[in-house]
Amino acid sequence: MLKIGIIGCGTIATMIAKAINYKKINGTIVALYDKHNDKSQDLNKLTNAKICDSIDKLVKEELDIVIECASIKSVEEVATKSLNHKKNVVIMSVGALADKNLFSKLYKIANDNEKKIFVPSGAIAGVDAIKTASIGRIDEVSLITTKPVYGLEDALKNKGIDTTNISEPTVVFEGTVFDAIKEFPQNINVSVVLSIASKIPAKVKIVADPSATSNKHEIIVKGSIGTIKTVVENNPCKDNPKTSALAAYSVIRLLKDLSEPIIVGT
């Protein structure tokens, strides 16, 4: 049985706890931490875990894996401390890995400790095919993400865009994955997953659509294998419209696979 520690007790952590209770994961949540203690207390209504008051204390528990569900800013600390305490780690706030220096640092720490960093596929499809294609040559990776205006509201306000003036599908960003994750840190983690899988930086376009009711991700990858095209329209989580249900399911599936005798997919 997988012994799990969770850092960040929000929507995804709650869905993991429910999946364990429904026997979809052969595991148990041993320890929890959130900088807002009330969130840890709320999540612990679904578990029988130890509530820790720091990341340092959580990583010292007897765990097989630590799941980061907190924020991009927390990734370096969570991953570094988990790996150095001989724990595998899952990074949900994968946007942090757009930082090349941090990526290289965590790669080395994981390698030195003979542990793994897991990056779930998140809210997109085709990651297995793209990883496989990267064995050959990939020439181009592009992502067009369309989201409801309310799902992008915080980032748009930070850019000085008045969302009340958006009355039709509007391109609010076009550029590299590196700039995309800086301007939309809570909305475009999938672009970093795509870039890691393909090993080349994705070209990103973000569209705010006032009529949209789901998050849509269109991916085109071209290379020596030909062309890969995928389109996913994700329903949001009921409890948090900024989180796609598929993103939460991807980490649940990953945890399930870690204890499965047969694993399908690359």
From Swiss-Prot:
Pathway connected to this protein: Cofactor biosynthesis; NAD(+) biosynthesis; iminoaspartate from L-aspartate (dehydrogenase route): step 1/1
Alphabetized UniProt keyword annotations: NAD, NADP, Oxidoreductase, Pyridine nucleotide biosynthesis
Top EC class of this enzyme: oxidoreductase
Active site: H217
Record EC number: 1.4.1.21
InterPro entries for this protein: Asp/hSer_DH_NAD-bd (IPR005106), Asp_DH (IPR002811), Asp_DH_arc (IPR022487), Asp_DH_prok (IPR020626), L-Asp_DH (IPR011182), NAD(P)-bd_dom_sf (IPR036291)
GO molecular function: aspartate dehydrogenase activity; NAD binding; NADP binding; oxidoreductase activity, acting on the CH-NH2 group of donors, NAD or NADP as acceptor
One GO BP: NAD biosynthetic process
Keyword Phosphoprotein: no
Residues annotated for NAD(+) binding in this entry: A123, N189
The reaction(s) this protein catalyses: L-aspartate + NADP(+) + H2O = oxaloacetate + NH4(+) + NADPH + H(+); L-aspartate + NAD(+) + H2O = oxaloacetate + NH4(+) + NADH + H(+)
Family: Belongs to the L-aspartate dehydrogenase family.
Further information: The iminoaspartate product is unstable in aqueous solution and can decompose to oxaloacetate and ammonia.
Function: Specifically catalyzes the NAD or NADP-dependent dehydrogenation of L-aspartate to iminoaspartate.
UniProt protein name: L-aspartate dehydrogenase
Organism whose genome encodes this protein: Methanococcus aeolicus (strain ATCC BAA-1280 / DSM 17508 / OCM 812 / Nankai-3)
Gene: nadX
